[in-house]
Amino acid sequence: MMHILVTLLLVAIHSIPTTWAVTCTGCVDLDELSFEKTVERFPYSVVKFDIAYPYGEKHEAFTAFSKSAHKATKDLLIATVGVKDYGELENKALGDRYKVDDKNFPSIFLFKGNADEYVQLPSHVDVTLDNLKAFVSANTPLYIGRDGCIKEFNEVLKNYANIPDAEQLKLIEKLQAKQEQLTDPEQQQNARAYLIYMRKIHEVGYDFLEEETKRLLRLKAGKVTEAKKEELLRKLNILEVFRVHKVTKTAPEKEEL
């Protein structure tokens, strides 16, 4: 009886698809047969060549990048290729095609519409969420900002804290109109956060940014759900848009009671 149970367990384990074992939310698992056809279906593809069952900080960073990319654009495929140097040597020929160093995994490539046009992430660059975003931004017209951030808002809010009050009010009015045009609920929520911070900085001055950052960090460090942590992180990312190297504008005087 015990022998039968062990046999059934082994069969079940070997029947589990490898895509279940490799946890990378939003990633497509490619192999030698599907690689070229899949990459050619997208304007751009970021592909990570790695060991068959990756783990650790670099894999976690790539997974986080995948989540951010899916929120930001439909024109970018995020994929993985598991390379085995044992058994049937799965995908080893594909790794050899791109001169992947199996002693220095992972190797990350950005493909531009076909399997022969690509750029490799330099081996000296750390595999982090921010570096992967920068890699895509530097080599494509795509924008993958920090979670919560809106490209159009970021572009017009540079040095917002230092511009005259009248210009701040004009920007508030302008972005209020843009916020009303947004159809995605999450984007609408993020836009509301921008507008709240714009009004607060206009009313209180730059000190608000420092005080609000500390408050949100305290909340994030407390006992909150993962969903709440993600919400707080989005707000912190939006707040960073307003940060300036030097404050040149005098804060509004507080009214005496």
From Swiss-Prot:
Statement: the UniProt record of this protein carries the keyword Oxidoreductase: no
Keyword Lipid metabolism included in the entry's annotation: no
Spans annotated as CXXC motif: 24-27
Signal peptide: 1-21
Gene label: wbl
Consequence of changing residue 239 to P: In T6; induces dorsalized embryos
Impact after mutating residue 41 to S: Does not affect homodimerization. Abolishes homodimerization and subcellular targeting of pip
Source species of the chain: Drosophila melanogaster
Domain of life: Eukaryota
Keywords: Chaperone, Developmental protein, Endoplasmic reticulum, Signal
Record's protein name: Protein windbeutel
GO CC annotations, alphabetized: endomembrane system; endoplasmic reticulum; endoplasmic reticulum lumen
Location, primary (coarse class): endoplasmic reticulum
